């Protein structure tokens, strides 16, 4: 059973869930210690091609995959993913005509529709397979805390949503008492740049967030929808790191949202869950709407009945992006 991301993780105010935070804090110390030792003891090995890591400092929901897609498109690179949720250990090149999300994971299958994508639980083996297949550069989706591969460049993606008491790092505590994969200072010390990914309706990043990240170059990008939401009433659903972000984006774009159903990240939709959503939509004569990542996980018969709402990362200053990644 997969659990949904606790929303209180991303509340900057420690007054929310104080007992839970306190009880989980010793486990956070252990998690942080194990992560630090693993990184310190590792000896990264060369993959045979430059590797750009696009990673997270938090447990998910920052918008990393759209940034991976944009950088890989820009550089003509191959994407490397662990293939979370997939059954194949790899290395294997993803073929959308052959593979299903249950084999290679949802994000790799989604990206493979227009990019060369590899999945491998062994990141080094996957990067070397991509290099052997002719990859000029490998863009690694996630892996900032994975020290096995020598990285030419490490970018960390940070959620730029800071309204309504949200903060991308919560109160700074490490998993499971908070959203951090490791302490902020430790993660930033290994980064070459940070990407603040803003929601489409937020004009500029919080100056305090820019200041916190200022020890590395900071790039600004915006998560822009590829088109308006469908006309008419919609029942929307999402099983992503922060499903409430999808709901908020739809409302900001003017979607006539009659109901929103959140699911855990990478949720495997079955016929029963989808039938309930379809019944709810039928009550209001509504359409069914989801994210591109969720849509790729749907059983093929349901893809005709549900519309995806794709988004892409648009960088505010493309010259600044080229200055960071263009030398590879």
From Swiss-Prot:
Taxonomy, superkingdom: Bacteria
Pfam families the record matches: LpxK
A GO term from the CC aspect: plasma membrane
Alphabetized UniProt keyword annotations: ATP-binding, Kinase, Lipid A biosynthesis, Lipid biosynthesis, Lipid metabolism, Nucleotide-binding, Transferase
Biological or metabolic pathway of the protein: Glycolipid biosynthesis; lipid IV(A) biosynthesis; lipid IV(A) from (3R)-3-hydroxytetradecanoyl-[acyl-carrier-protein] and UDP-N-acetyl-alpha-D-glucosamine: step 6/6
A GO biological-process term: lipid A biosynthetic process
Enzyme Commission code: 2.7.1.130
Catalytic activity: a lipid A disaccharide + ATP = a lipid IVA + ADP + H(+)
Keyword Electron transport assigned: no
Protein residues bound to ATP: 58-65
Family: Belongs to the LpxK family.
Protein purpose: Transfers the gamma-phosphate of ATP to the 4'-position of a tetraacyldisaccharide 1-phosphate intermediate (termed DS-1-P) to form tetraacyldisaccharide 1,4'-bis-phosphate (lipid IVA).
Protein name (database record): Tetraacyldisaccharide 4'-kinase
């Amino acid at each position: 059973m997969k659990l949904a991301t606790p929303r209180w993780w991303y509340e900057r105010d420690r007054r929310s869930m104080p007992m839970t935070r306190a009880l989980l804090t010793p486990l956070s110390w252990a998690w942080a210690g194990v992560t630090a030792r693993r990184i310190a003891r590792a000896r990264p090995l060369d993959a045979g091609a430059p590797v750009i890591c696009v990673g997270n400092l938090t447990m998910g929901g920052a918008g990393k995959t759209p940034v991976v897609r944009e950088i890989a498109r820009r550089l003509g690179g191959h994407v490397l993913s662990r293939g979370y949720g997939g059954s194949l250990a790899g290395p294997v090149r993803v073929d959308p005509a052959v593979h299903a999300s249950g084999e290679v994971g949802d994000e790799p299958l989604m990206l493979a529709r227009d990019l060369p994508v590899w999945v491998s639980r062994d990141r080094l083996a996957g990067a070397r397979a991509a290099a052997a297949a002719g990859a000029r550069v490998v863009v690694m989706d996630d892996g900032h805390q994975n020290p096995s591969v020598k990285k030419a460049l490490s970018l960390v993606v940070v959620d730029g949503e800071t309204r309504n008491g949200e903060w991308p790092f919560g109160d700074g505590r490490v998993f499971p008492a908070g959203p951090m994969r490791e302490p902020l200072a430790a993660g930033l010390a290994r980064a070459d740049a940070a990407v603040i990914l803003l929601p489409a309706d937020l004009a500029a990043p919080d100056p305090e967030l820019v200041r916190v990240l200022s020890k590395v170059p900071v790039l600004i990008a915006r998560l822009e929808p590829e088109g308006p939401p469908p006309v008419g009433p919609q029942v929307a659903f999402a099983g992503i790191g922060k499903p409430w972000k999808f709901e908020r984006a739809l409302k900001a774009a003017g979607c006539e949202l009659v109901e929103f159903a959140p699911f855990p990240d990478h949720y495997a939709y079955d016929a029963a869950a989808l039938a309930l959503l379809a019944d709810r939509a039928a009550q209001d004569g509504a359409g069914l709407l989801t994210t591109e990542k969720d849509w790729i996980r749907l059983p093929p018969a349901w893809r005709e009945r549900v519309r995806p709402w794709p988004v892409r990362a648009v960088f505010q200053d493309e010259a600044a992006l080229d200055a960071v990644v263009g030398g590879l």
